[in-house]
Amino acid sequence: MQRHLLLGLAGLPALLSAQRVSVTCSFATVAANGETCDSMAATWGLDTATFQSLNPKAKCPEVIGGEQYCVVGTVTTVTGEPTTAPATTSTQTTTTTTTEVTSTTVPGNGITTPVPVQPNLVSNCNKFYFVNKGDNCADITARYNLDLSDFLEWNPKAGNSCSGLWANAYACVSVIGYVPKPKPKPTSTSTKPPTATGNGIPTPLPTQPGMTDGCNKFYLVKPGETCADIASRNGVSLSDFLQWNPHAGNACSGLWANAYACLGMVAFSLKSRFRVDCTGDAHNVVNIAGDQGQCINTDCSVGSLEIAAAGVCPDGEVQISYWEQPGCQGKWFGYGYAKRGECRGLWTNGWKFKAMHLRCAKSQDDCVNKGSCAYDPEPAQGVC
C-alpha cells in the first residue's frame, strides 16, 4: 500500500516553483550605433545587471543601434505554484517582488543621483532639475541664476543650441564646489527723470547695470520679461541686445525689471571744435544713428572733429564729405576719413567749405576710389 502511494505521487507533475518577470517601462531611449549594454547602463547611471533586468530580451553585451531600450522602469517578479497542481490543491501561494529603478549613487562622490539623467552628465553634479517638456536651457539657467556656459559644461549633450536637451530627464544645475551667484536686484523701482550723459543723449533712469555708452534708444523692462522677448518685440538681435546690456548675461538672469535697457546704439557721436586740435568752443554736438548720416553746417567756425569712441560704425570708420555751401549744397570737394575715438583736423583747416556730410563708410567703397565719380577742384581762396 505504501509502495502504491509512492508510485502515484511519483506520477504527478513536479511541484516546482515557476517565475514570471514583468517590466513596466517608464522611459526608453534609442541606442546609438556602437553602444553596448555596459555603455548605455553607465550613461544612465545604472549597473549592467539592472539594465539587463529592465531589458530581459537584450542580448548583452551587445545592443542594436536604432532599437529602443528601457532605462527607467519597474521590474516585477512573480513566484507561484504551477498551474498543473493537483485538484486537491485549493490555494495558490504567490510572492511578488517589485524592483523600481528610481535612483542610483554615483560611485566616488556619495551623491544620490536621480534617473534618468541627461546623457554624459558630469560625475560631480550635486543638484538636479527634472526637465519638463517645453523647457529650454535659457529657462533653466534663468531659474537657477546660472551662466549658460556653466550649464552646458555640466550638461554637454545639450549643445550650444540646446537641441540635445532631453525632456523627462534630470539636468545638472550645480556641481561640488560651485558657489551660486547672488541674483542682483535693482536698488530702486522708481523711474527717475532723464539725465544727459557725456554724449549728449538724454538717458532715462534707472538703467541696466553696465549698460553700454552711446545708447540712443531705451526700453523699460517689465517684471517677467526676458531678453529674447524684448529683442524680438523690438526688432533687434539677441546678440546685440546682450552686447548693449552685458549685465543681463547669456542666461538673461542679470536683467533688472523696472530699469531701462538699451535697444539701439548711435553710429557715432562727435563735437565740432573751433581749433584744429579739438580745443576751443564746441560748435556742434551730434549723435548720428543709422547708416544714412547727417549734414552739419560749420558756419566757418569748425577746424576739427572730436569723435567719441563709442558707436557701431563698421571698423570705426567715419566718412567726411566736404561741401561748399550750407545744407551740403554747391560744389563738392571730396571725402576725408576719421576713426572713432580720435581728434580729426579738417581739410583746409575749415576755411574752404561751409558744410559736411558725416556717415559710417569705408574708404575703399567710395565712388572716388572706385573711379565712378570726381570731386570739384579746391577753390583758390577760402569761402569763409
From Swiss-Prot:
Residue span(s) of domain LysM: 27-71, 127-173, 217-263
CDD domains noted in UniProt: LysM
GO terms for MF: chitin binding
Disruption phenotype: Does not affect virulence to host insects.
Signal peptide coordinates: 1-18
InterPro entries in the record: LysM1-like, LysM_dom, LysM_dom_sf
Functional summary from the UniProt entry: Might have a role in sequestration of chitin oligosaccharides (breakdown products of fungal cell walls that are released during invasion and act as triggers of host immunity) to dampen host defense.
Protein name: Secreted LysM effector Blys7
Source organism (scientific name): Beauveria bassiana (strain ARSEF 2860)
